[in-house]
């Protein structure tokens, strides 16, 4: 788990969590990728220090940056869906993953503003603008890394999925 490794650059730390959410959904698919992230969130909620800055607990998830953590659930669902349904259409995957990122920014920033009472313009300057270029790189890396890994694991994942349905 790379979530704890973060760079505190302000109210919202830089972390690899968006990349890992994208990768989990890209490689494992919509259901399993989302479940993997939910397990991570639950582990963090009970206090295991898996969140940014080696932190955890309800205060982390319900605090100012918790909206982003919760919005990653939708990011995993959307990424997994588009990869499963439109695997050959990489441009569409990138667009849907970017839309998921925008939704994550919107939900997370709304939560942040509600928690901190910071003006929206300032919250955007602190919580969104510095992250857009890096998060777009993470999105691209998820596609570049996720495709070959998913293809190599395809038989294994299909066998596991069939076994879980039996």
Question: What feature does the model see in each segment?
Answer:
Residues 1-13, 41-75:
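Interfacial aromatic-anchored transmembrane helix boundaries in multi-pass membrane proteins
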Residues 1-34:
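Hydrophobic transmembrane alpha-helices
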Residues 2, 53-54, 82-86, 114-115:
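Helix-loop junctions at the membrane-solvent interface of multi-pass transporters
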Residues 19-23, 34-39, 65-70, 91-99, ...:
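Hydrophobic alpha-helical transmembrane segments
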Residues 27-31, 78-86, 149-153:
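Structural signal for the C-terminal ends of transmembrane alpha-helices
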Residues 33-40, 48-51, 75, 79, ...:
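Alpha-helical transmembrane segments and their lipid-water interface positions
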Residues 58-106:
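Short helix-perturbing small/polar motifs within transmembrane alpha-helices
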Residues 87-161:
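Membrane-embedded alpha-helical hairpins and interfacial helices in multi-pass inner-membrane proteins
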């Amino acid at each position: 788990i790379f979530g704890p490794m973060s760079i505190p650059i302000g109210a919202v730390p830089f972390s690899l969590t968006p990349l890992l959410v994208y990768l989990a959904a890209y490689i494992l698919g919509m259901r399993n990728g989302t479940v993997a992230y939910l397990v991570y969130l639950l582990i963090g909620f009970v206090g295991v220090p898996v969140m940014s800055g080696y932190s955890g607990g309800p205060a982390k998830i319900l605090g100012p940056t918790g909206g982003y953590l919760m919005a990653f659930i939708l990011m995993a669902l959307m990424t997994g869906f588009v990869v499963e349904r439109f695997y050959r259409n990489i441009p569409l995957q990138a667009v849907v993953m970017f839309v998921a990122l925008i939704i994550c920014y919107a939900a997370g920033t709304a939560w942040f503003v509600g928690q901190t009472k910071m003006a929206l313009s300032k919250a955007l300057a602190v919580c969104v603008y510095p992250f857009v270029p890096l998060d777009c790189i993470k999105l691209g890396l998820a596609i570049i890394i996720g495709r070959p890994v998913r293809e190599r694991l395809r038989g294994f994942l299909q066998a596991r999925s069939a076994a879980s349905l039996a």
